[in-house]
Amino acid sequence: MEIKEISVPQQGVVADYMNGKKEIQSCFDYMLTEDAFKQRVQDLREREFFRQDLVTHLLEYNTKLQAGEATIQNVKALGDENTYVVIAGQQAGLLTGPLYTIHKIISVLQLAKEKEESLGVKVVPVFWIAGEDHDMDEINHTFVTKNKKIKKTIFHDRNPKKASASESELSLEDCRKWIEEIFKTYPETNFTKDVLQFVDDSLRKSNTYVDFFGHLIMKMFVNSGLILVDSHHPELRKLEVPFFKQIVSKYKEVQEGLLNQQEVIKELGYKPIIETKSNAVHIFMEIDNERVLLEDNQGEFVGKDGTYSFSYEELIEEMERSPERFSNNVVTRPLMQEYVFPTLAFIGGPGELAYWSELQQVFHTIGFRMPPVVPRITITYLERDIATDLHDLQLQESDPFLNNVDKLRENWLSNQIEEPIDERFVEAKKEIMNIHTSLQQFVKEIDPGLSAFAGKNEFKINEQIELLERMLKRNVEKKHEVELNKFRRIQFALRPLGAPQERVWNVCYYLNQFGLDFVDHVMEKTFSWNGKHHVIKL
């Protein structure tokens, strides 16, 4: 594996943050400098965490996932007041979801290792599974290539309900069939049987979406020391009760902090992405097997436009009695993470970085400082046959990342023809229509009754010209079919659906192509934190 770094243009908050623009960096509490990380350690030393209770829970949870010895030792290390975490999180996508989930974990592992060495303190990697999420449409699918098209393959749950991913039971037989259908779209390799067995071993131990995700990730990273946490685990929720109470008692200040920070973002020229109602409480409550967002209504806490209503005392009482019924929204999830873990750094994708820029005053409302927010490592895998296609078309390896592949294709095709087809036909249509306009005027003067027919005649002529243009283009494309197929393969591999590879394709394709140790080989590489995109040549 060889790594090539490419500067890919970014926009908005992410671009300015990575370029060191002071205005947007002022929306975060720490710069990404070594001095800032040292200061973060000092700041964390002044806070108290329920470390022993957390260790007890994480030992039980990670042992259940059959964690390796390195993970168990890292969990135990969390009991020491001089141990800190690098953390990232993601929803529990089936088969681990898009590649960027894997890349987030690799980012966490690398940064934890680097900071442990440079700061001289114990730093452990943690991955937060968003078990409270109830939007199944975001986690119940993957993309495959079928009949020369990219298709979204959805796992249709026979018993769908608005429950969280931690509580949504998987039909193992149905899921197994869905997985087999996905693997049928992959080429049969020497690794296919082993990868299917690897996935099925995790599936057999699972009851829910989060179980399956957790088992698969732990199996994939078993020797890395990675600690997994299910954010909606009932035992973890018990530990979070004091902070849920704090949020409920300060929900107005939390909302005010959010709105004030969003005003700052607007003044800097950015568009806020977090949308909330003015009476938001920022906590979900499970009611009748549904996750319901609570809102304020004249001092009462209501859900579903008043269908459910609780007093402050009733809500606090319910939190103490059934903490597993409560969960965070996009605003309070980062706060809960900060409450639970001694967070040296949070690693996020571009979208997360943008919405965290809206949370600074929310953190301050609770008495927290935002942890250093580090953009995750971005990666694209360049297979040998795709590299050959690029070479055959005389394209640079960076071209698909800096240009629209369709545009590259059009430019290449235009260069194969002396005169561009589009321009020639536009010119011809213009000349013919000018002549026809004059002809229509002549017809109208002699016989006005034929004016409508003359207009239809113009339409028919235009139709025939466009038909000729389409046929010519089709024949030209047929003539260059071999080369154009190379463009299609490049687009499917590197920019599927016009998006980055890591936002569409799933890691199982690469395990099937290169073996179960594929992720281990990627982890052996050292990635830079300079904001550049990493292209790994396979």
Swiss-Prot record:
Group of enzyme by EC: ligase
Keywords: Coiled coil, Ligase
Residue ranges of coiled coil: 460-484
Source organism, top-level taxon: Bacteria
Listed EC numbers: 6.-.-.-
Keyword Protease: no
Pfam family, one: CC_BshC
Molecular function (Gene Ontology), one example: ligase activity
Keyword Ligase in record: yes
InterPro entries: Bacillithiol_biosynth_BshC, CC_BshC, Rossmann-like_BshC
Function: Involved in bacillithiol (BSH) biosynthesis. May catalyze the last step of the pathway, the addition of cysteine to glucosamine malate (GlcN-Mal) to generate BSH.
Family the entry assigns: Belongs to the BshC family.
Protein name: Putative cysteine ligase BshC
Organism from which the protein derives: Bacillus cereus (strain ZK / E33L)
Upper lineage: Bacteria, Bacillati, Bacillota, Bacilli, Bacillales
Gene it is expressed from: bshC
